[in-house]
A protein has these predicted regions:
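Cell-envelope/extracellular polymer assembly enzymes that use nucleotide-activated donors
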Residues: 16-19, 49, 201
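Short, acidic, metal-binding catalytic loop of nucleotide-sugar glycosyltransferases
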Residues: 36-47
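A conserved acidic beta->alpha catalytic loop
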Residues: 54-63, 108-109
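Glycine-rich, basic loop-to-helix element that forms the pyrophosphate-binding segment
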Residues: 80-96, 117, 171, 175
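Short aromatic/hydrophobic "clamp" motif used to bind/position activated sugar donors
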Residues: 101
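Conserved donor NDP-sugar-binding/catalytic core segment of glycosyltransferases
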Residues: 112-145, 220, 224
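Catalytic donor/gating beta->alpha subdomain of glycosyltransferases that bind UDP-sugars
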Residues: 138, 191-254
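Membrane-embedded multi-pass helical conduit in multi-pass membrane proteins
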Residues: 264-347
């Protein structure tokens, strides 16, 4: 990380309170380590409260949070009956006492200087929002988990425009950001109709109001990916599906890269139809019916094995040559999600704008 010292003028004033908002549901595996990383945050330039917004967990998540909250007054538990992420974020923002809001994830641990550094960088770059670099980690030592982590961290898996592969600088969206609370309320906080991509939508609305978003390499967080191919497939399908819904709600929040897997799968299907049609075509034209599918397959194999070679060289691990299978799973499930949403004319869900907090745990 960049270690250039800060000047006094880059420090926020008056030791402000930062409210960290953490949306969770059934996160008993991760929640304790996440909270410990937050309780160990550097508070030399700010105070910190941690709002855990639980979406009616059916596992031990709530009990773990209550136990930690009973020992540490900085932790508060809120209940999100609607369960969806944007409701959780808005509940946290609504209940926050801080001048600043930090929106965090439950599968992630944070460097000790994460919040303090993002707060400094927010002021240094006169930004509307700031986050650190997101480092992708496997959630277990299983080789499948390693393959998934490598794929999600590689530009061929998630594109060079993804917040997981971008370099430091101003960006169109950022992971786990800190904002002035007034900046969030200015744009109406998160859109509760968007169960996914609510961060892209918020980022676009902030930029439209003139707020810049900055990604700093002075600090980092570690995101632990789901460890199985089944969970990756489900994640990819839902993401692709919601990209179409998000596009309908706010076209400016989505870019071409969000639809490339859909174009890939559509092209694959068309090429497959052409390939099968070659059976009934005149013999001298059959090659032309088969060539598009063969060309697409060859191009994808070259690209995916090129990415695999890059990963294997970096990690010094030959199992990386299995990543083409993971790339293919990610891209096809994502693309099928896009095409499914188009085929059924997927629409935004209805929503209840009300905020309801059933229980708050304070010690």
């Amino acid at each position: 990380m960049n270690s250039t010292p800060y000047s006094i003028r880059q420090e926020p004033h008056d030791h402000p309170l930062v409210s960290a908002v953490l949306a969770v549901r059934n996160e008993e595996r991760y929640i304790e380590s996440v909270l410990q990383s937050l309780l160990l945050q550097d508070t030399s330039i700010c105070d910190l409260e941690i709002l855990v917004v639980d979406g009616d967990s059916s596992d031990a998540t709530r009990q773990i949070v209550e136990r930690i909250a009973n020992r540490n007054a900085r932790v508060r538990l809120l209940i999100n009956h609607r369960r969806k992420t944007p409701y959780a974020f808005n509940l946290g923002i609504h209940a926050a006492k801080g001048e600043y809001i930090c929106i965090l994830g439950a599968h992630t641990t944070y460097a000790k200087d994460y919040i303090a550094t993002c707060l400094r960088e927010l002021h240094l770059h006169n930004a509307g929002g700031c986050s650190g670099v997101e480092i992708i980690r496997p959630s277990s030592d299983d080789f499948q988990a390693r393959l998934i982590a490598w794929v999600l961290a590689h530009p061929f898996g998630t594109s060079t425009g993804s917040m997981r592969t971008r370099k430091a600088g101003f960006s169109d969206t950022i992971p786990y950001p800190i904002f002035l609370k007034s900046t969030l309320t200015e744009v109406g906080a998160y859109d509760i109709q968007l169960h996914r991509n609510q961060d892209n939508d918020l980022s676009q609305r902030l930029r439209a109001r003139g707020h810049k978003l900055y990604l700093t390499d002075r600090t980092y967080c570690e995101y632990f990916v789901s460890p199985t191919l089944a969970s990756l497939s489900k994640y990819a399908f839902k993401t692709g599906f919601w990209n179409i819904i998000s596009f309908k709600k706010n076209r400016a929040s989505m870019s071409l890269r969000h639809f490339v897997p859909g174009v890939f799968v559509a092209g694959l299907l068309l090429c497959l139809v052409a390939f099968v049609s070659a059976i009934s075509a005149p013999e001298h034209t059959r090659l032309w019916f088969r060539l598009p599918l063969l060309s697409l397959i060859i191009a994808y194999v070259i690209a995916s094995f090129g990415a695999a070679f890059n990963i294997a060289s970096r990690e010094r691990d030959a199992t990386a040559f299995l990543t083409p299978l993971i790339f293919l799973t990610l891209h096809t499930c994502y693309g099928v999600g896009v095409l499914t949403a188009v085929a059924i004319n997927a629409r935004l869900p209805s929503c209840d704008p009300g905020l309801l907090v059933e229980k708050t745990v304070d010690s």
